[in-house]
């Protein structure tokens, strides 16, 4: 499975050939550097590790610097391993948007926006206990009863409650590639991609 590491640039709108307005996401992807090639004989499985984004050497560990020097490249901010990569590659090779085609469908994995600690209304879409009347107050966003008193006399595991929201790994499938600009390393896909501007993303072919 081929892929690339990139980051989210932002959103825009484009018209298709039929005049429909499409909400699109702009992604910057590549060029990625092959930082390691894993083989069945040496590592037990076949995979290619790609690196993306420049990191200053003073901010990298000695182990990381040595790892990237083997590939004759500078330290990278982000690395990712792609198993069963379609192309035959070796350390130091560069991979760009040429592996994708306009009109094809891709899968994107990224990190969703972190919302912090949120209540049940925002986190799970609860409607609240009800109107703030009949003697009630400050109950319009409350979760309500958590469980029965006699039966089951406990709170079930997995009950939806308040807690930390967002900041999760999210995979979005079947995003259509609308446009590719190889010179600027930009790709435009139809639809939304989780995360804020600058979020690192993994593109799967």
Predicted feature residues:
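Extended basic (Lys/Arg/His-rich) segments that typically form rRNA-contacting surfaces
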Residues: 1-205
């Amino acid at each position: 499975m081929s892929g690339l590491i990139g980051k989210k640039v932002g959103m825009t709108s484009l018209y298709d050939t039929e005049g429909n307005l499409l909400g699109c996401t702009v992604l910057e992807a590549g060029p990625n550097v092959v930082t390691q090639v894993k083989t069945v004989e040496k590592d037990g499985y076949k995979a290619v590790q790609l690196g993306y984004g420049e990191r200053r050497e003073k901010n990298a560990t000695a182990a990381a610097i040595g790892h990237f020097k083997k590939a004759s490249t500078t330290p990278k901010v982000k690395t990712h391993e792609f198993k069963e990569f379609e192309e035959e590659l070796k350390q130091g090779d560069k991979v760009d948007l040429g592996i994708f085609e306009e009109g094809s469908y891709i899968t994107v994995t990224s990190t969703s926006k972190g919302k912090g600690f949120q209540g049940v209304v925002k986190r799970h879409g609860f409607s609240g206990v009800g109107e703030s009347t009949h003697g009630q107050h400050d109950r319009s966003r409350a979760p309500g009863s958590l469980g029965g008193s006699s039966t089951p006399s406990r709170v079930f595991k997995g009950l939806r409650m308040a807690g930390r929201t967002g900041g999760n790994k999210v995979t979005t499938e079947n995003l259509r590639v609308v446009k590719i600009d190889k010179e600027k390393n930009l790709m435009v896909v139809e639809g939304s991609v989780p995360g804020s501007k600058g979020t690192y993303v993994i593109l799967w072919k």
